[in-house]
Amino acid sequence: MVTVLLIFLCLPVIFSSSTFAAVSDLDPECLAPFAVYLIFTFVTATCVCSIITLLITSLQFFDYYYVRIVYRRHHPRYQNPQIAALLQLQP
């Protein structure tokens, strides 16, 4: 689970950097107006999706660790072994 979250945290950086690298070599004076607007739309959509992905994954990442910290701090007599196994915690 942690590796999946870390991969999803890296995806926005990869998407943004690859999009900006691809667009940085373009010369807008040589392109038709429609192509420039299409590229601008693509870059904007990529940035918005990257920000949304980063936000959602960050919330999941913090929630993942917050649940484990709260569960470990809870009084030991209330800790359920089945829940600990579900959270993959060591007793």
From Swiss-Prot:
It is found in: Host endoplasmic reticulum membrane. Residues 57-91 are cytoplasmic. Residues 22-33 are lumenal. InterPro entries: Adeno_E3B (IPR005041). Residues 1-21 form the signal peptide. It holds the Pfam family Adeno_E3B. One of its GO terms (cellular component) is membrane. Keywords: Early protein, Host endoplasmic reticulum, Host membrane, Membrane, Signal, Transmembrane, Transmembrane helix. It comes from the Viruses. The chain crosses the membrane at residues 34-56. It is a single-pass type I membrane protein. The keyword Methyltransferase does not apply. Belongs to the adenoviridae E3B family. Down-regulates the EGF receptor. This is Early E3B 10.4 kDa protein. The lineage of its organism: Viruses, Varidnaviria, Bamfordvirae, Preplasmiviricota, Tectiliviricetes.
